[in-house]
């Protein structure tokens, strides 16, 4: 049964109640992104840090009171040309030394009593300074980000499948409950290992919150409003990014910032009590043939939208009786999983292509942001420039995608991203700093647009019965791209050039792949696997509709006045009317004994006439 044309309009369409539910679905996006981007502040390395002086490495005749603070540091810590005091080494003097001139042979050793740090991007302490993750322990910083992204990958895959089995609401409530509890537990971490495991687990649950709210939001909209609803949720994410630096300055310590970021998740637990602010998706209920639940859901939506499901004679029976006649009384729920994509041709191809484009969109951003770091080492310059380009990407999608189509704008974003990357790769040493900055900003803008549009496009073209699992696979590929930057940092950026070459090549290759995608602009969401398989890519070049029209060979079916929809509606209404005892009128018919034959009946009529 077609939900978009036969069910959705009769429940009020994108009415008042649908709008209210969509508004409440934006708040989880803010809470999730607040916890996601706080990871940037947890792992940023201070610009200034050095070893703490160790008196045990100094000779017994040394008196610190005879030296100034800077002189004391110069005697105990090596000075590196161009970078100031050494980050990881100390001077060790002979025990009986009395001459502290540079001619004295001094041994360089690793730090022994810890480090002294400057202020960390608004925070006084973070994950790095809490456990001294510098020098030989630097590798634990990218490892933390890899663990966090691994949690998101597992969450997208597992909870995406769970979203198709349990429903959008149940998956959301399960994820929000566990993510809030894990967020509180992260504040109490007492070691690096505990912090890594808790962040991995919380990332998995945050992925479930984001995925379930994203899908539920789009399934409650009609085609003209889907894009704007999705992009407004993106602005909520941007607002969370803009708010984080101020929160970091106010909180000062990372456990306090983590607690503040967890508060919105705790507030979302109120969705347990208020089922009306985040109801189950009626589209998913109908697609999985949960007839009793979908009837209650449709009645709730129609009532809150101010529309009654009414028949010409009996209220509330036209749409519901059509559902009964379409599915039958003994219909059992039927659930699907992403494993069924093995039997499809179009759906898995679309899923693979959009996973590839999202992987490129997130992975190639590291190449552009690294050029920004080369232009300015200021943390806030790169951070706010990234936020501004994200906002511009949202605005670009809002203004262009509904006019030129999803596929066309995705293709344009991939082309500009690839060109920017190739120009930076080939001409960086020949370009001035301003041109490098412009190309990096343009590439960052369109790579973010590529990532946003890939996720939105995937949610539109995947069928309802496997939308959670398929979108989870696509978003998981995006997290793999985000984790690729940490892999480069784990190798001390030794493979950056190869990383840039690979992603630039992938961006060019994605241009060809995008041509194979269908167009979903102003089209209903597919519900079944059959609907997903029926999607076809539009022709690359426009052609006349009657170009291949041969009238003599055209076999048109004879016109008929028969309409199966009207007939089924008439049959269902008649059946309902005949089963009622209190009919609106009764037809008076003469009583006739069933035992009388036709001849006896004719004789009785002649006697009456005589």
Which residue ranges define each predicted feature?
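Flexible cytoplasmic loops linking transmembrane helices in multi-pass membrane transporters
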Residues: 2-18, 76-139, 304-370, 374, ...
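Hydrophobic core of transmembrane alpha-helices in multi-pass small-molecule transporters
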Residues: 123-124, 129-134, 194-207, 266, ...
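Central mid-sequence intracellular linker of multi-pass
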Residues: 46-108, 112, 228, 250-326, ...
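C-terminal transmembrane bundle
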Residues: 33, 37, 199, 234, ...
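Cytoplasmic helix-loop-helix junction between adjacent transmembrane helices
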Residues: 131, 198-234
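Structural signature of the two symmetry-related core transmembrane helices
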Residues: 170-184, 193, 235, 409-424
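Helix-breaking motifs and short loop linkers at transmembrane-helix boundaries and internal kinks
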Residues: 167, 188-193, 251, 427-430
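Hydrophobic alpha-helical transmembrane and interfacial-helix anchor sites in secondary transporters
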Residues: 46, 162, 247, 400, ...
